[in-house]
């Protein structure tokens, strides 16, 4: 685990009305106040490389921290940074297991983990954490909501950024519900649609994601589960909004619709963990993608995590 970097940014004052994220995020240590947000980085693009994508997402966690650090807070917040799980060389599976252990430990300690990627291979590591935590008690119906242009259900010979949800569904069967909002038909072969149908995957195409339809899709999904893992692949957004990804979207889901979806999930009381995938700073334009991702995470955390007492 790489230690948490220092969050820095503009300081207008130290009283509550002046606070920004960089002034409230502290290094995480066991025994930290429960019911807090804990940020974790996952520095990996080995899965993207294996999936024949454009590498660079390993730099995503720190770029996301830098974009979020100067954002102003409406009220005082309590947050921690647990550092970054770093995938060294080709040791993706080892990194995913390490991420899973970190996420499980945070959940068991009563925290809300927010994981910064990294390629979408992050998803298998985050899932291992949820599956291995006490939050998933016997009989708990776990759901994964993926905001993504791709199913990520490939049957590749080795795990990659294109395989995590097939790995999960192959292991879990009907014990996990999986839904994808924002699917781009031209970016997924007929074979992938067949795989999705075989696994019972619900999906909503990007060109049908008006706010009302998107929220109805999410409501139906949430009604069937007890616990939700939300994963946001930034290539679900239009390329003009999120150019800094391996596979920019020609169409994409508008940001206001995605924000409404995230609000609905946050308000459900079922959200256990969220991660953000595929931020590639080397492909970004004026930090546009990083700032958009930071805005979404800011919104989710401030809506989901209670304000500390006193």
Curated annotation (Swiss-Prot):
Pfam family, one: Arginase
Annotated binding of Mn(2+) 1, by residue: 120, 148, 152, 233
Reactions this protein catalyses: N-formimidoyl-L-glutamate + H2O = formamide + L-glutamate
Cofactor(s) demanded: Mn(2+)
Enzyme nomenclature, EC number: 3.5.3.8
Note on how the cofactor is bound: Binds 2 manganese ions per subunit.
Keywords annotated in UniProt: Histidine metabolism, Hydrolase, Manganese, Metal-binding
Signal sequence interval, chain numbering: none
PANTHER family linked to this entry: ARGINASE/AGMATINASE, FORMIMIDOYLGLUTAMASE
Protein purpose: Catalyzes the conversion of N-formimidoyl-L-glutamate to L-glutamate and formamide.
Protein's name according to its UniProt entry: Formimidoylglutamase
Phylogenetic classification of the source organism: Bacteria, Bacillati, Actinomycetota, Actinomycetes, Mycobacteriales
Gene responsible for this protein: hutG
């Amino acid at each position: 685990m790489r230690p948490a970097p220092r969050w820095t940014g503009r300081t207008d004052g130290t009283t509550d009305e002046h606070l920004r994220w960089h002034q409230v995020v502290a290094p995480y240590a066991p025994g930290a106040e429960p019911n807090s947000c804990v940020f974790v980085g996952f520095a990996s693009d080995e899965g993207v490389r294996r999936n024949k994508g454009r590498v660079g997402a390993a730099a995503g966690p720190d770029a996301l921290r830098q974009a979020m650090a100067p954002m102003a807070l409406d009220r005082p917040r309590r947050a921690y940074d647990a550092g970054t799980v770093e995938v060294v060389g080709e040791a993706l599976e080892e990194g995913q297991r390490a991420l899973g252990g970190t996420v499980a430990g945070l959940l068991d300690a009563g925290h809300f983990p927010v994981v910064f990627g990294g390629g979408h291979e992050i998803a298998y590591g985050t899932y291992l954490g949820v599956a291995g935590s006490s939050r998933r008690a016997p009989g708990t119906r776990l759901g994964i909501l993926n905001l993504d242009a791709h199913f990520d259900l490939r049957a590749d010979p080795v795990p990659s950024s294109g395989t995590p949800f097939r790995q999960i569904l192959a292991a879990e069967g009907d014990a996990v519900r999986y839904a994808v909002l924002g699917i781009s038909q031209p970016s997924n072969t007929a074979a992938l649609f067949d795989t999705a149908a075989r696994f019972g995957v619900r999906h909503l195409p990007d060109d049908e994601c008006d706010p009302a339809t998107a929220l109805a899709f999410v409501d139906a999904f949430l009604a069937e589960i007890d616990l939700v893992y939300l994963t946001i692949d930034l290539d679900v957004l239009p390329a003009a909004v999120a150019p800094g990804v391996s596979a920019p979207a020609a169409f994409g889901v508008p940001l206001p619709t995605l924000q409404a979806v995230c609000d609905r999930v946050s308000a459900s009381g079922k959200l256990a963990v969220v991660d953000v995938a595929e931020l590639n700073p080397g492909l970004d334009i004026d930090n546009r993608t990083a700032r958009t991702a930071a805005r979404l995470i800011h919104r989710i955390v401030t809506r989901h995590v209670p304000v500390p007492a006193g």
